[in-house]
Structures are given as structure tokens and as C-alpha cells.
Amino acid sequence: MMQKLLKCSRLVLALALILVLESSVQGYPTRRARYQWVRCNPDSNSANCLEEKGPMFELLPGESNKIPRLRTDLFPKTRIQDLNRIFPLSEDYSGSGFGSGSGSGSGSGSGFLTEMEQDYQLVDESDAFHDNLRSLDRNLPSDSQDLGQHGLEEDFML
């Protein structure tokens, strides 16, 4: 009888040990993953980038190379519009005087024009391109003309 009780106690001890060790592992192990991306405004002079993160999702260990495609409806459009309102990706700040076109000439601040403002300056049509007009014969080199650096300065101006 004593031997039978000893065998049963060993069996109970083994079962208890298995239950205690398995209780630390709860379910199938998973890893959490998240989509991350950077949204930038390439038209500005500075980088102006925002790092955005998607929601967390469970990634099974065998599926690390099988990341599911990001659904386009994860973020409502209102959230992105709120981000654009909070963090504008534009250099046009109302009331700052910078890039607002509130004046022209040297009296409107530092006189520094951004690249975009230089592209879109208003031109007075009455005197546009009339000062530097030359005939085609004068612009082309002739056989008798020396191509060295002799001549008038205006011949070398573009």
C-alpha cells in the first residue's frame, strides 16, 4: 500500500509541476506590429515632415514576412484634416507678412523673395523685354568677329 501511495504522490507532484510551469505561458505567443510612415511637403524650403503611426495589430511569429496591407479606412479623413489644420505643411502664414504678397519693392521687409515669389512676380507690360532687344544679326557671331573677350560689355550680357 505504501508503494502505491508513493507512486500516486509522484504522479500528483508531476501533474502539479506541469500545471505550474504551463501557467506562465498564456496562449500562443504573438508580436505586436504597427504601420509607420512619414508625410512630407516637398514644395517647401524646409523638410516639413510629420511622422505618423497606425494602430497596433497582432503579428503571428510565422507571418513576419506576410504583413497585411494597410487598409485605407483605418484613419478617418477628419483626423487627417485635423492634422493639416494643426500642423500646416505650408509656408504661407496669414498675417506674418512672409509670402503674403502684401507689398513690393525694398520697403516691404527684408527684400528677400522666395523661389516661388520670384517665379510669379508681376511684370509691367509697357516696358517688358524692350530694353534688351537686339537684332538677330547682332547676337550671332560673324566670320569677321573675334570670339575673344574684346568688345562691349553689353555683348556678353544675357
Curated annotation (Swiss-Prot):
GO-annotated biological processes: apoptotic process; biomineral tissue development; granzyme-mediated programmed cell death signaling pathway; maintenance of granzyme B location in T cell secretory granule; maintenance of protease location in mast cell secretory granule; mast cell secretory granule organization; negative regulation of bone mineralization; negative regulation of cytokine production
What start and end residues bound the annotated signal peptide?
1-27
Which keywords annotate this record?
Apoptosis, Biomineralization, Disulfide bond, Glycoprotein, Golgi apparatus, Lysosome, Proteoglycan, Repeat, Secreted, Signal
Origin species: Homo sapiens
UniProt induction comment: By Epstein-Barr virus (EBV).
Gene that codes for this? SRGN
User: What protein is this chain from?
Assistant: Serglycin
Q: What interactions and quaternary structure are annotated?
A: Binds to activated CD44 and to GZMB.
Instruction: List S-S links within the chain.
Output: 40-49
- sequence repeat positions in this chain? 94-95, 96-97, 98-99, 100-101, 102-103, 104-105, 106-107, 108-109, 110-111
Pfam name, any one: Serglycin
Location(s), subcellular: Cytoplasmic granule; Cytolytic granule; Secreted, Extracellular space; Golgi apparatus
PTM section of the record: O-glycosylated; contains chondroitin sulfate and heparan sulfate.
**GO CC terms in record:** cytolytic granule; extracellular matrix; extracellular region; extracellular space; Golgi apparatus; mast cell granule; platelet alpha granule lumen; secretory granule
Could you tell me what this protein does? Plays a role in formation of mast cell secretory granules and mediates storage of various compounds in secretory vesicles. Required for storage of some proteases in both connective tissue and mucosal mast cells and for storage of granzyme B in T-lymphocytes. Plays a role in localizing neutrophil elastase in azurophil granules of neutrophils. Mediates processing of MMP2. Plays a role in cytotoxic cell granule-mediated apoptosis by forming a complex with granzyme B which is delivered to cells by perforin to induce apoptosis.
